[in-house]
């Protein structure tokens, strides 16, 4: 019995078999299995939801520095859920440990916390570093937020072209905020040639993707009779 067999059962949707195998492996001290079993308890897969078991398993695995246990535990502390009190400082430390172990969403969370000074000293240059690390691994929100830093010159030298590239990548991935921000660049001619038609098209895409400000703009343009749809 190996973690690979347990993972295969889980990925095939055989949660009962996966739960049984993860339990055996977790009891034997396998940190990957502890993490997966904690996730199953958290989501009630082949078992009743159990916050205490989830916390116990994530904590054990995090002590062994299992990357996703660190990240999942950080989310609990960040939001004050799962039987723990809200603790931004603990959340930051756990996210940072996960980020250092190549977990892209943890890299993004570390960057976001550094940018806002949540659970740590505000540091725009460190935020830019971690946004870039997450973006390199395809994290769309990281591309978008890095683009904002390049646009405003926070933590990095202001760079119109890099800003445009970052927003473009976020938009290519279908991120509503990416569409909206890229549309603003085309509207302003920031990092690209001004193109109001492209700006409007991107604003529409953002609206269709659920962006509230874009919806408002499109609605106002329709009401004014400037566009049909």
Task: Show where each model-derived region lies.
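Terminal, low-structured helical/coil segments at or just beyond the last alpha-helical repeat
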Residues: 205-229
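Short helix-capping/linker turns of helical repeat alpha-solenoids
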Residues: 13, 27-30, 43-45, 63-67, ...
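N-terminal segments that cap or nucleate solenoid repeat domains
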Residues: 1-36
């Amino acid at each position: 019995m190996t973690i690979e067999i347990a993972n295969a059962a889980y990925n095939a949707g055989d949660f009962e078999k996966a739960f049984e195998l993860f339990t055996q492996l977790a009891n034997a001290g396998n940190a990957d299995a502890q993490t997966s079993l904690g996730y199953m308890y958290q989501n009630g897969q082949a078992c009743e939801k159990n916050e205490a078991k989830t916390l116990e398993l994530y904590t054990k695995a995090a002590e062994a520095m299992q990357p996703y246990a660190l990240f999942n535990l950080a989310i609990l502390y960040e939001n004050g859920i799962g039987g723990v009190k809200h603790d931004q400082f603990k959340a930051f430390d756990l996210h940072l440990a996960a980020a250092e172990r190549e977990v892209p969403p943890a890299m993004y969370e570390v960057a976001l916390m550094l940018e806002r000074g949540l659970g740590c000293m505000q540091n725009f240059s460190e935020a830019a570093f971690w946004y870039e690390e997450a973006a390199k691994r395809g994290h769309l929100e990281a591309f978008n937020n890095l683009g904002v830093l390049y646009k405003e010159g926070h933590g990095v030298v202001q760079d119109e072209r890099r800003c445009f590239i970052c927003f473009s990548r976020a938009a290519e991935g279908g991120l509503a905020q990416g569409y909206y921000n890229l549309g603003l660049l085309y509207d302003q001619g920031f990092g690209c040639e001004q193109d109001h038609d492209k700006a409007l098209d991107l604003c529409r895409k953002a609206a269709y993707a659920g962006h509230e400000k874009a919806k408002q703009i499109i609605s106002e343009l329709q009401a004014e009779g400037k566009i049909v749809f």
